[in-house]
Structures are given as structure tokens and as C-alpha cells.
């Protein structure tokens, strides 16, 4: 646990995150013992609110259009800073995870979440390693501010919520998104972009042998 001038950053295990989520009023324990949460108006991914920052490393490699919508790099920086200031006034939850298990292809990610439940989700959907980033790779960062409200006129988003991937900055911004699955989809999109550049074919599947 690290003291901040305005709030605190908590790095908790799953059990403590569940307790924190309950204490914060984020959800309740269901009859089967699972933590039950509400996702708000969005019960799944929100494709119309998903963007990728268009910059030198991506401009010629991504099929831009209705699915991969471009986002201005300067607008991203301004919005990231606004969300960062918003989170600095609140208690936040840190998860240090790996996306992928292979030592050559995993991505180390620091997840900073406004809610304990989003932090817990990141620890469960990704890998919580015994040793974080042993290959000392460049780290990615996810900011998840589920209660933040974007201003489409000022921020360039399509609604009060957004999911924006910035490959050059190695950042993913989730603002106004209570559906935690956007974290998984965003980082899978990152892997699906980066791995073919290494002659590795990513597969969205699983197998028990």
C-alpha cells in the first residue's frame, strides 16, 4: 500500500479485493458465493466507443474504418491526463499482471482501477505472476475509471464512455465503462496486432488435451 497526497493506491489479493468491493458498494455476494456486479447500461462490449490512436507506428498497418476508429494522439493525451487527475482524488487499486504466459510474448501490464472489482477482474482474466516482468520488458498501463464521464464535444468520444488503445504510448484508457470485459478485449487486440509482426499467429481459442 502506497500513500498518495490525495488518496491511496491499494495492491490487494483477490480475497481482499472482494471485501473492498463489498465495502465500497460495488456489488454483493450471490447465493452461490460469487461476487455479483452491475455493469450499468452496457452489458457487453461497446464497439462504437472503441478507438485506436492513429500515429506513425499504426497509421499504415491498421485497417481504419467503422471497426477500427482512429483517435487523435493529442486528444488522447489530454483525456488521459484528465482521467489521471480524476483518479488521483480517489482510492485506486493496482494490479500487476501478464497478458500471455510465454516468456517471449507476454505483455507486462500495470492496471490502475477506480474500483476494486475491476482490479479483481484484471487479476483473474490475466495472469498474476509470482514474479512480475522477469524479462524486464517495456510495460503497458491501463487506466480504468468506470464512473468518469467523457464529454464528446471536448474529448472527441462518441458518448460519455470510451475505450482507447495507444500503441505508441503503451496505454489503454477505459473511461465511463463499468463492463470490465473491455480490459480483456483491449489487451487481446493489442496482442493480435503485435504478435503477427513477430510471425506469431494469435488464436482466440482454447484446448484441453
Residue map of PLM features:
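A noncatalytic interaction/capping subdomain that flanks phosphate/NTP-handling catalytic cores
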Residues: 1-205
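Glycine-rich phosphate-binding P-loop
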Residues: 207-209
Amino acid at each position: 500500500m502506497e500513500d498518495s497526497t490525495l488518496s491511496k493506491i491499494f495492491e490487494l489479493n483477490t480475497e481482499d479485493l472482494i471485501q473492498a468491493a463489498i465495502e465500497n458498494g460495488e456489488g454483493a455476494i450471490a447465493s452461490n458465493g460469487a461476487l455479483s456486479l452491475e455493469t450499468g447500461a452496457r452489458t457487453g462490449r461497446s464497439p462504437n466507443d472503441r478507438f485506436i490512436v492513429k500515429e506513425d507506428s499504426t497509421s499504415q498497418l491498421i485497417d481504419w474504418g467503422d471497426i477500427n476508429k482512429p483517435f487523435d494522439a493529442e486528444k488522447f493525451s489530454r483525456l488521459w491526463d484528465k482521467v489521471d487527475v480524476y483518479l488521483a482524488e480517489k482510492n485506486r487499486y493496482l494490479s500487476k499482471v501478464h497478458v500471455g504466459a510465454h516468456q517471449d510474448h507476454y505483455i507486462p501490464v500495470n492496471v490502475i482501477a477506480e474500483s476494486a472489482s475491476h482490479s479483481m477482474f484484471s487479476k483473474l482474466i490475466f495472469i498474476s505472476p509470482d514474479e512480475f516482468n522477469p524479462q524486464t520488458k517495456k510495460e503497458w498501463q491501463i487506466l480504468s475509471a468506470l464512473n468518469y464521464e467523457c464529454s464528446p464535444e471536448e474529448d472527441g468520444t462518441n458518448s460519455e464512455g470510451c475505450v482507447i488503445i495507444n500503441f505508441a504510448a503503451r496505454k489503454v484508457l477505459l473511461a465511463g465503462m463499468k463492463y470490465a470485459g473491455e480490459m480483456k478485449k483491449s489487451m487481446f487486440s493489442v496482442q493480435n496486432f503485435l504478435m503477427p509482426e513477430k510471425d506469431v499467429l494469435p488464436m482466440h481459442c482454447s484446448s484441453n488435451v
